Swiss-Prot record:
Known cofactor(s): Mg(2+)
Principal location listed in the UniProt entry: cytoplasm
Protein name as catalogued: Fructose-1,6-bisphosphatase class 1 1
Principal EC category: hydrolase
Documented EC number(s): 3.1.3.11
Self-association and partners: Homotetramer.
Keywords per UniProt: Calvin cycle, Carbohydrate metabolism, Cytoplasm, Hydrolase, Magnesium, Metal-binding
Pfam families according to UniProt: FBPase, FBPase_C
Amino acid sequence: MNSSDSTSLELSYDFALDRDCTTLSRHVLEHLQSFSPEAQDMSALMTRIGLAGKLIARRLSRAGLVEGALGFTGDINVQGEEVKKMDIYANEVFIAAFKQSGLVCRLASEEMEKPYYIPENCPIGRYTLLYDPIDGSSNVDVNLNVGSIFSIRQQVGNDPDHTGQDLLQDGHQQIAAGYILYGPSTVLVYSIGKGVHVFILDPSLGEFILAAENLTIPKHGPVYSVNEGNFWQWEDALRDFTRYVHRHEGHTARYSGALVGDFHRILFQGGVFIYPGTLKNPDGKLRLLYESAPLAYLMEQAGGRASIGQSPLMDVVPDHLHARTPLIIGSTEDVALVESFIEDRERQAEEELALKS
């Protein structure tokens, strides 16, 4: 076979794959095994999220060539953090993607103090989208991985003052969650409570195409992902765990500064991601509603676990929209190992207290 025949065969094979591919919207309907209004809503919601991901991916691919993509705006957000230009752009993209959809009554983002209401949607929009528009935005300026995280909740109760108090519920109230990873390829991972599924954006088609279904995380993995630069700001239990993995073979450290990127690696390879509280921030840095709870939902669907140290993260009820929480998430055995060091320190503290009394 000459080179032209080989090329022709390769192109023909690619075309065959494209013809038989499963798109994101089709996959949602197939998994719900229904064309009911609710199923069509969920398919449309995921399609809109995919649209936002495509627009953000396109902007990121040209970040060094267009104005308004790199650097800071000079503003401080509700979290007390400097705002990156891509944070603002991505936040506005999600709003624009849903504004004319008729699907959601409001959007809640870590970039906005209060939920963004879409009055024309509220009579019929039955859902709320919660999201982190750009996770790891400090990586944008140096061309490293970043991501978007999303969660969908059913619209419940009333919110007369538009502060989103009815959203202060545990993670079990989510009906869907996922993330988009912007890297060498753009990957969308989602769950609607029926397993975890992976899609890759095919630029030639402009569609997210199914790459893996019913993904499960290994019960144990080699990777531990934590910012060891904060070592002396942690409680003793986390330092004990870190010393343990340093001294025992079979553990390797990977930390990129982007939660989505580190989570994605662990979801595929197994291991544990840790973002603990510190002396300065005892509740940690990650926002429960926009980051931790959506990823916990995914992890449990993949057969893993998510913990705050002594209790399941999915059980935590926030006391305000931007509440933070520590996060220990990953393979069941690796999360249990971290928890064992926390339990040991708790037991030691109780024994010391008993001796003093």
